[in-house]
UniProtKB/Swiss-Prot annotation:
SMART domains: HMG (SM00398). Participates in the Wnt signaling pathway. Binds to DNA and acts as a repressor in the absence of ctnnb1-A and possibly ctnnb1-B, and as an activator in the presence of these proteins. Required early in development for the establishment of the dorsal body axis in response to maternal Wnt signaling. Residues 109-311 are annotated as: Interaction with AES and TLE4-A. One of its GO terms (molecular function) is RNA polymerase II cis-regulatory region sequence-specific DNA binding. Interacts with csnk1e, ctnnb1-A, ctbp-B, dact1-A and gsk3b. May interact with ase and tle4-A. Keywords: Activator, Developmental protein, DNA-binding, Nucleus, Phosphoprotein, Repressor, Transcription, Transcription regulation, Wnt signaling pathway. It comes from Xenopus laevis. Transmembrane segments: none annotated. PANTHER family: TRANSCRIPTION FACTOR 7 FAMILY MEMBER (PTHR10373), TRANSCRIPTION FACTOR 7-LIKE 1 (PTHR10373:SF25). It is found in: Nucleus. GO terms for biological process: canonical Wnt signaling pathway; regulation of transcription by RNA polymerase II. This is Transcription factor 7-like 1-D.
Length: 550
């Protein structure tokens, strides 16, 4: 038989060469460019026809399952002409159901009698993005075309690893033969086809025959023990884009399937396939339900248990009776004398009654108090006998816990603001009293000048603008406040102060205490109009002066 030259890639056959298999029920069409490889291709087709004469009906049904043609886009520059040639002949090469899905080999499913016995069914090839021509009977067909980038590297048809596989995608074989676990990866060297003499990769049965499922085939996952070989009457599945065939016999799984299978089975101990898929295409519940349903429940159980345990502990603490501490000597005296004091006095307040009882207790002599101390000692002994494990820390600890639970961050902020306001109350009272004389107003430590004499006072807040000067510490008013403090130290009387004040202020302003409001502390540009308005503001009551200054 004539031998083809195996050295050149694109020169093995004509570029427009088309191949037909008679078992597909289609008529042969010969292209005008078929060359010297016609005899070898006829031998290949005749061998396929002889093997598949009894299975033509199944092959026809497979042709009917084929999806409608769809345009695919080839990224490598070397495949542009080949893609155009394949798309013209839609009778044999038909487009993939999903753009970019790789090559697929469909065996004759009707001829499978035992999954462990290798058979040679008729092979139908669909054109996908990356051709995987691994059958020994079609090596001439594969090598007649331009080699793929994977073929140029190591003569092994390898496709890129998928990047968007479905999390429940297991592995599935496209061959009817079970792999031999002891086959080393060193057999990947190219072999010589006995008919054509063209180098070809080894038979897929010699490699690990496992490919990932496509996302559309997730609903047809087999039983985990019936591994990965399609049974009679079940169609094969398309391979996801760039499906990667592992060179080792080990199973390359994703993260979700490795938790189910890899932890229980070593790669060389996968049982022989003997279970078929569900007829409805629904995966076995042993695959889906343990992973999907148990993961969220495991995350939700722990917080619920912790919440329940905390509630149970709190309820147990509440159920325990509150044990009062034993009474001391003074408490025993109060218990005895309280009724007498209430009868003698008309006071009903508990604090006043306790003060009276305290004075009487201290007025007692040592001998009279010793009686109550003895009663208190007996009380402690009785309490220790009734509650041997009791300690005063139990009650104090409970009180602290209750306070922490009741106190919220809003209440803490509220108490802080209240404390800040209380600090300024004395200065407000001194400024609000109109009866205070001018001398006392300047000499008292709560006066505005004394409050502003130290430059370390904090900055004024927004609420202090409507208040007198004692609460206002704006930088513009520092000079005026220091001058007022200096004058107050030199002249305690109002008459001497009037001579030192500047002329715009004048003596009419000192006829009564000066309400140093925020109008005096305005910026320098607004200072003269504010001083002119001061005589008008003095005719109003003092609370209105602070309001009108806003």
């Amino acid at each position: 038989m004539p031998q083809l030259n195996s050295g050149x890639g694109d020169e093995l056959g004509a570029n427009d060469e088309l191949i037909r298999f008679k078992d597909e029920g289609e008529q042969e069409e010969k292209s005008p460019g078929e060359g010297s490889a016609e005899g070898d291709l006829a031998d290949v087709k005749s061998s396929l026809v002889n093997e598949s004469e009894n299975h033509s009906s199944d092959s026809d049904s497979e042709v009917e399952r084929r999806p409608p043609p769809r345009e695919t886009f080839e990224k490598p520059r070397d495949y542009l002409s080949e893609a155009f040639r394949r798309q013209q002949d839609a009778a044999f090469f038909k487009g993939p159901p999903y753009a970019g899905y790789p090559f697929l080999m469909i065996p004759d499913l009707g001829g499978i009698t035992c999954p462990m016995v290798p058979s040679h069914p008729a092979l139908a090839y669909l054109q996908m993005k990356w051709p995987l021509l691994d059958s020994p009977s079609t090596a001439g067909l594969k090598d007649a075309r331009s080699p793929s980038p994977a073929h140029l590297s190591n003569k092994v048809p390898v496709v890129q690893h998928p990047h968007h596989m479905h999390p429940l995608t297991p592995l599935i074989t496209y061959s009817n033969e079970h792999f031999s676990p002891g086959t080393p990866p060193g057999h990947l060297s190219p072999e010589i086809d006995p008919k054509t003499g063209i180098p070809r990769p080894p038979h897929p049965s010699e490699l690990s025959p496992y490919y990932p499922l496509s996302p559309g085939a997730v609903g047809q996952i087999p039983h985990p023990l019936g591994w990965l070989v399609p049974q009679q009457g079940q169609p094969m599945y398309s391979i996801p884009p760039g499906g990667f065939r592992h060179p080792y016999p080990a199973l390359a799984m994703n993260a979700s399937m490795s938790s189910l299978v890899s932890s229980r089975f070593s790669p060389h101990m996968v049982p022989p396939p003997h279970h078929s898929l569900h007829t409805s295409g629904i995966p076995h519940p042993a695959i889906v339900s343990p992973i999907v349903k148990q993961e969220p429940s495991s995350g939700n159980i722990s917080p619920n248990l912790s919440m329940k345990s905390n509630v149970v502990v709190k309820k147990e603490e509440e159920k325990k009776p509150h044990i009062k501490k034993p009474l001391n000597a003074f408490m025993l005296y109060m218990k005895e004398m309280r009724a007498k004091v209430v009868a003698e006095c008309t006071l009903k307040e508990s604090a006043a009654i306790n003060q009276i009882l305290g004075r009487r207790w201290h007025s007692l002599s040592r001998e009279e108090q010793a009686k109550y101390y003895e009663l208190a000692r007996k009380e402690r002994q009785l309490h220790s006998q009734l509650y041997p494990s009791w300690s005063a820390r139990d009650n104090y600890g409970k009180k602290k816990k209750r306070k922490r639970e009741k106190q919220s961050p809003e209440m803490e902020n509220y108490t802080k603001t209240k404390k800040m306001c209380v600090q300024h109350f004395p200065s407000d009272k001194s400024c609000d009293s109109p009866a205070s004389s001018h001398g006392s107003m300047l000499d008292s430590p709560a006066t505005p000048s004394a409050a502003l004499a130290s430059p370390r006072e904090p900055a004024a807040t927004h609420s202090e603008e409507a208040q007198p000067l004692s609460l206002t510490t704006k930088p513009e008013a520092r000079a005026l406040s220091h001058s007022a403090a200096f004058l107050a130290s030199k002249s305690p009387s109002s008459s001497s102060l009037s001579g030192h004040l500047p002329s715009p202020v004048g003596s009419p302003l000192l006829s009564r205490p000066i309400p140093l409001t925020s109008s005096i502390l305005s910026p320098p540009g607004v200072f003269p109009p504010a001083l002119q308005a001061l005589p008008l503001l003095q005719a109003q009551p003092l609370p209105l002066v602070a309001r009108s200054s806003d």
